[in-house]
UniProtKB/Swiss-Prot annotation:
Main location: secreted
Phylogenetic lineage: Eukaryota, Metazoa, Chordata, Craniata, Vertebrata
Tissue expression pattern: Expressed by the skin glands.
Protein name in the entry: Dermorphin
Modified residues (Serine amide): S7
Species per Swiss-Prot/TrEMBL record: Pithecopus hypochondrialis (Orange-legged leaf frog)
Amino acid sequence: YAFGYPS
């Protein structure tokens, strides 16, 4: 999870 996106 990074920058509000999955994975």
